[in-house]
């Protein structure tokens, strides 16, 4: 998820 990896926006949350 994005919350786990700040900087990557491939997660379900932008």
Curated annotation (Swiss-Prot):
Keyword Secreted on entry: yes
Residue(s) carrying Leucine amide: 14
Localization: Secreted
Tissues expressing this chain: Expressed in the brain, subesophageal ganglion and in the retrocerebral complex (mainly corpora allata).
Gene Ontology molecular function, alphabetical: neuropeptide hormone activity
Family the UniProt entry places it in: Belongs to the pyrokinin family.
Protein name per Swiss-Prot or TrEMBL: Pyrokinin-6
Species of provenance: Eurycotis floridana (Florida woods cockroach)
Origin organism lineage: Eukaryota, Metazoa, Ecdysozoa, Arthropoda, Hexapoda
